[in-house]
Amino acid sequence: MNTGSLPHLFARLAALERRIRDAVAARRQADPNPDDPFRGLYLSDEAIETLLASRREPFVPFQATGTAGRLGALAEVARLSSLDVELLLVALAPDVDSRFEQFYGYLNDDVTRRRATAGLALRLCGLPEAAAAGRSRLDPASPLVAAGLLVVEDRERPFLSRSLRVPDRVVNHLLGDDRPDAALTGVARVVDEPAVSADVGRLVQGLRAGIRLVYLRERPGGGAAELGAAALRQAGFGVVEVDAGRLRGEPDHAELVKAVLREAVLRGAGVVLGPVEDEPPLRAMGHPSVPLVVFGSELWNPQWSVDPPLNQDAVALPVASRAQLWRDRLGGRLAAGVDPASATAHFVLGPQQIARAAQAASVSALVDGGVVTVEHLRAGARGQNAAGLQRLARRIEPAVAWDDLVLPAGVVGLLKELAARAKYRGRVIDEWRMRPGGGRGRGVTGLFAGDSGTGKTMSAEVIAASLGLDLYTVNLATVVDKYVGETEKNLERIFTEA
């Protein structure tokens, strides 16, 4: 908890208290019966007569005393004017000092209304209640309200009698508490140290140039979320990562979107949102100071936003980056001579999948002496897509080896070439840069033909075993549909999971 900016905040509240005392004194002078014990619960005849005879004195605008610390940083990020800051302080005061509840109850002439109303806030800022310049700072599109820093309640009431409330998360932030909003648990998280990612130079340059919308197309093993987070960090922003699927499924979706934007503004952060399948809440999360990085597997849909994004593909991580991720996650638990990147080179894993696979390998190794072996690594890697595939195909755990095959030597040689191609494709395509044009050539395809019982499935099982992979068989009857489009979708789901 950082409390270094509290003295400045308390000094600003003290200045507000002096203005409130002046307002209370002026109110008591004009009140025909200031000591009435039922004041605020009814209006006497004398009070009505005094109200009818009252005249408004000329308003004296407040003198801004500057901003510093967290209040100043928030004003800069949220693009608050000096009037916005003063309105925020007026609304904030009862949450920091309980005496302000009584002050506001008195000035509101209602002991049950212990927060500042819009009218009272404007008066304390030295503005007429009818001043458009002041009222506009409290409408839904204003910087304070749009960023979720101030809530104007009681919408059914006349504007001047609507209560102003500062959300607890904003109060806590200004008091030095950096914990994220509890409402975002399971939906969003703050990323302090993004995982190793691909080159982010182009994205960083765009963010520093003022681009506020980025779309990353997720490729297998690419790690779009980590790419976006790394770019934001290098561009000087914090990172709030949002699970778009969970956000979309929450019943209070709209309020959570506001909470995400507020968290990003408080932290001076950007938002990483994905994976998206349909139109994301770009307008609700839009803010001139908050970069928004959206990612998904589909191409960007121009109908999602009137502002075009900076587009980039999140391609698979280079071998060196994957190796560094494995080493960072496993530390000194690896068995001697084991290269995790080589052992899992034929698995297409992104940064998050590598992190989960490394953790799974470490857990499995605990019952085998605590040393992580190649078998542990491959089992952890296999587990990253097993759940999704088993819903679409039948899993076979290989239990045979090359010596179990009874085939002509030439056929066995071809099978071993096929296995070698799958094993070393990462080195050939990534390290040696032998990828064909158009992004083709990553997959390995084999066509086995022969009568029943000649060893087609067994050969596939042997290849899978040599690579440390599981084998999945697909029943075409569950895939082929009378509509060609549905058949294509079924096949795409299988290969995407694989």
Predicted regions and their residues:
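Extended, charge-enriched "interface" segments that sit outside catalytic cores
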Residues: M1-F62
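Short, hydrophobic/amphipathic alpha-helical patches that form generic packing surfaces
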Residues: A11, L83-V96, A146, A230, ...
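AAA+ P-loop ATPase motor domain of ring mechanoenzymes
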Residues: Y42-V77, F103-R113, P158-V240, A244-G249, ...
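Structural motif
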Residues: L74-D84, A132-A133
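Short helix-coil junctions and helix-kink-helix linkers
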Residues: N108-D109, L120-A133
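Short, hydrophobic-biased segments on the C-terminal half of alpha helices
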Residues: A141-S142
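A short, conserved structural fragment
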Residues: V145-E156
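Conserved nucleotide-sensing/catalytic segment adjacent to the nucleotide-binding pocket
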Residues: L256-G286, T496-A498
